[in-house]
Amino acid sequence: TVIDVKCTSPKQCLPPCKAQFGIRAGAKCMNGKCKCYPH
C-alpha cells in the first residue's frame, strides 16, 4: 500500500506504516513515496 509520505529511506516509512497498519508492518521507499506492507 503506497501512502502519501515522502521519503528518502525505508527507515522514514516505518513509523507511519506502523501507525497505520500495526506494529509488524514492513516499509519500503519507492519513487520518493512510502510503501507499506501490512502483515
Swiss-Prot record:
Record site: Basic residue of the functional dyad: K28
Effect of A19Y: No loss of activity
Source organism of this protein record: Centruroides limbatus (Bark scorpion)
Pfam families on file: Toxin_2
Site description Aromatic residue of the functional dyad, residues in chain: Y37
Taxonomy, superkingdom: Eukaryota
Cellular component aspect of the GO annotation: extracellular region
Domain notes: Has the structural arrangement of an alpha-helix connected to a beta-sheet by disulfide bonds (CSalpha/beta).
Chain segments annotated as transmembrane: none
Function: Potent selective inhibitor of Kv1.1/KCNA1, Kv1.2/KCNA2, Kv1.3/KCNA3 voltage-gated potassium channels. Weak inhibitor of Kv1.6/KCNA6 potassium channel. It also shows a weak interaction with nicotinic acetylcholine receptors (nAChR), suggesting it may weakly inhibit it.
Family to which the UniProt record says this protein belongs: Belongs to the short scorpion toxin superfamily. Potassium channel inhibitor family. Alpha-KTx 02 subfamily.
The protein's name: Potassium channel toxin alpha-KTx 2.5
PROSITE patterns with a match to the protein in the record: SCORP_SHORT_TOXIN (PS01138)
Note: Negative results: does not block Kv1.4/KCNA4 and Kv1.5/KCNA5 currents.
Known tissue expression: Expressed by the venom gland.
Subcellular location: Secreted
Molecular function terms, GO-annotated: ion channel inhibitor activity; potassium channel regulator activity; toxin activity
Disulfide bonds: C7-C29, C13-C34, C17-C36
Gene3D superfamilies noted in UniProt: Knottin, scorpion toxin-like (3.30.30.10)
Keywords: Disulfide bond, Ion channel impairing toxin, Neurotoxin, Potassium channel impairing toxin, Secreted, Toxin, Voltage-gated potassium channel impairing toxin
